Amino acid sequence: MIQQETWLQVADNSGIKKVMCIKVLGGSKKRYASVGDEIIVAVKDAQPAFGLKDSTGKKVHNKAVQRAVVVRTTKEIRRPDGSYIRFDDNACAIIDDKGNPKGTRIFGPVARELRDKKYAKIISLAPEVL
């Protein structure tokens, strides 16, 4: 469960390493995000030398605001068959306004629930889908 002020690892090669959630998208009353939910994040640790650029053409730096989708959470997720899955860390992938990932690789496993939320591109880039 991701909420405001939660720090997350970035699971792609966009050059951003750590981010902090500043807003959970999906309505004014939505407080928590789970796997597959979109969030607004503030960059806390970035390597601008990688060349990722924001919508204005400037290189991404600390304090930049980006959109992201949650790909892993430490809070377990219940599946329809009754099983649960959880991960060792909270992680997200940086996306653009259309929902496409900005990175070209995804590191670590991602949850199968992303397929139901229409993030097939992230699923195809991930090395393992659990």
UniProtKB/Swiss-Prot annotation:
The keyword RNA-binding applies. Gene3D superfamilies: Ribosomal protein L14. Binds to 23S rRNA. Forms part of two intersubunit bridges in the 70S ribosome. PANTHER family: 50S/60S RIBOSOMAL PROTEIN L14/L23, LARGE RIBOSOMAL SUBUNIT PROTEIN UL14M. Part of the 50S ribosomal subunit. Forms a cluster with proteins L3 and L19. In the 70S ribosome, L14 and L19 interact and together make contacts with the 16S rRNA in bridges B5 and B8. This is Large ribosomal subunit protein uL14. InterPro entries: Ribosomal_uL14 (IPR000218), Ribosomal_uL14_bac-type (IPR005745), Ribosomal_uL14_sf (IPR036853). Disulfide bonds: none annotated. Belongs to the universal ribosomal protein uL14 family. It comes from the Bacteria. Pfam families: Ribosomal_L14. GO terms for cellular component: cytosolic large ribosomal subunit. GO terms for molecular function: large ribosomal subunit rRNA binding; structural constituent of ribosome. The keyword Ribonucleoprotein applies.
